[in-house]
Amino acid sequence: MAMLEDRLLIWRLKRGHEPAMARVYAKYKNLLLKLACGLVRDTAAAEDVVQDVFVGLAESVDRLKVGGSLKGYLIQSVLNRARNLHRANAVRRNGNPVTEDVPATEEVRPDRWVLHHDQLQHLHEALRQLPPEQREVVTLHLRADLTFREIARLQNASINTVQSRYRYGLEKLRTLMNSEFES
């Protein structure tokens, strides 16, 4: 059903139907932002990546060729822009990790917030230490809820390779996180 809706949206986009762009944005904005945050670990940069993807989509809609799903196309666009950002910032890799918001509850005490904040910083630092291929697979699987088959298509790799990258990435994250809490 989603594929059918996406094909209809693409058809409408190519014919200049403005509400179709609004629907694509509403449908995929949160997923793409969550994915971009996991890949670039900076909220402002992630928002820029997602905005660039939608601006690029709007500017190139007349030449748009989506081989698979619109979701896959947009995810691949976010991946490409995040990779470009990493390459552009290769010299400045020592920035601060993103801190995600603590879930809003009335009972968030300062000591719990500090603990949550510290754990998130350590997790982001551990993610930063993963090889790019492993970090990408872990992020796509856990944050964007993509299957290994979908990730394999996006990375042009075999499913076994993607599963291995995921497994090794989780093992390394576990080791890095445990070493922090033991020290």
Predicted regions and their residues:
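Helix-turn-helix DNA-binding module
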Residues: 128-136, 140, 144-164
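Structural recognition of an alpha-helix C-terminal capping motif at a helix-to-coil junction
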Residues: 34, 48-55, 68-80
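Conserved RNAP core-binding helix
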Residues: 9, 25, 33, 41-60, ...
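Internal acidic/polar
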Residues: 2-6, 84, 92-116, 120
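N-terminal module of bacterial RNA polymerase sigma factors
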Residues: 1-31, 38, 128, 149-150, ...
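Arg/Lys-rich amphipathic alpha helix in sigma70-family domain 2
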Residues: 59-66, 76-97, 116
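Sigma70-family region 2
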Residues: 14-15, 41-42, 51-69, 88-90
